[in-house]
Amino acid sequence: RFFAFQYGWSTFTIIQTAAISALAYVFAESLQSIVHLPEVLGSLSDYNIGNVFYPFKNFNVKLAAIILILLLSWINSKGLKLGAWLGTAILLLVFAGLFTIIGFGLTSHEANLHMAFSMQTTNSQPITISGMFTAMLAAFWAYQGWASVGYIGGEAKNANRNIPVGIAIGVFIVIALYLLVNTAYLSLLPISSLELINQPGNGIAAIEAVKIFWGRSGELFIAILILITTLGCNHVTIITSCRVYYAMAKEGLFFKSARQLNKHAVPENSIWIQCIWACVLVLSGTFDQLTDMIIFAIFFYY
């Protein structure tokens, strides 16, 4: 019970709310790359708290992220049926986009599958287990969604069977897509190019890979795909995470108001409490700061 209490509050303060904030931030940055967002409160951009947090820096992006969180929270407060319809539509669009990248990436004339499976490195240092683990650290966040399935166990039909099956199928799909997409990237971009892209401010590997066979239009395609993907992931994170605080509140471990259901049988107060804190986290830092907090907290409990 003690560790469950600790995990529940960590889920609220960092793990899930920071994930919501980070995903909304990526959505807003992708939107900024498509439609230039007007500057907001630019005169306050240098205001800081302890020379660490700059709440008004890139405030136009942060404001767009906050609006997205508010909108998705409102949609999810109107019932699971509306939320499920939106989630299904987004999922189909994401699959279509990913399979487009995989198909064109692996079959284009510029693709070199041998390069994708090469063990060549850009330095003389040997490949070690610790090095592989460090490289995979951020990638582990892609698999974190498996834990969220259990959050809605109380509302699932035949949960004892369907929850484990859903987790197994979901993780398998993520593994397959992750390997296929990265094979496409590696067949188009040599390791040296990926190393340069990984340096701060140099771009995104997906965009550079797609530009090889689609040119500048590929950049727009990836930006739109990132918009759709982060929208869908954020939607699911909001709809599942609030169930944790609802369950905690029923046991007296969270704010009492979070245990109340609205007329749609949804823990609306839990959703809005989560929404408020996620918006605060958006103002607190950048995408890198948010994801660093998430990964640290997640691995502590693993």
Explain the meaning of each model-derived region:
Residues 1, 33-42, 120-121, 127, ...:
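TM-loop-TM module centered on a large, flexible mid-protein loop between adjacent transmembrane helices
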